[in-house]
Amino acid sequence: PAPAPVAPPLLLRWQGALAKAPAGPLSSRFSLLAGLMLCALMAGLPLVTRSGLTLLIAASGLLWLLLALRTPPGEVGAINRWVLGIMALAVLATGFSPVPTAALHGLFKLLSYLGVYALMRQLLATAPIWWDRIVASLPAGSLVTSVVGIRQLFADTGELARWADPNSVADGTIRIYGTLDNPNLLAGFLLPAIPLALVALLRWRGLARQAFAAAALLLGSAALVLT
């Protein structure tokens, strides 16, 4: 006889609660919506305001929640166990925090980031075609902010930041900030975006794709130095 199906973990039994509900007009387009949402989030990291990023992150979490309600739970992988463990520790720390309001705010922020992770994991597991599209979104955002930052050198430099360290040979050096209003923030964004552009340049095929990755790599590296 066939072995009895293993019941999903108690924590995941809510998933698939709406699997038998009538499908709406957007049910067949969940992958498209999730992909566009994640691409907009990745590309908009250096371009969108903090309020805009908050809306994109919240929308990503809500979209994952709707997708999870219509998808039966699967096996909990090793990485997801670590993620659930971190979430459990965060909930425990929030409960024992001497400043519960601030701790609760931090917990909500963590859960919103985990919602983005969960949506990305779900999308890439069911539609791997979005891998390259999401990866391309981050260098696209870095390319735009790098161009804006480099152009700042050819405009009025009176408002640009300058290196303030009298003991350094770089004292007084002009520092660009692109769309992020702070050279350190621009450098912090470019540090992970540049390796992704390099990987894309080595992996992608086609002249247009490679030219895009090369432009993001070269201009991002130049902007990083100029920060």
Tell me what each language-model feature is.
Residues 1-105, 115-139, 200-212:
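Transmembrane signal-anchor hairpin modules in multi-pass inner-membrane enzymes, especially those
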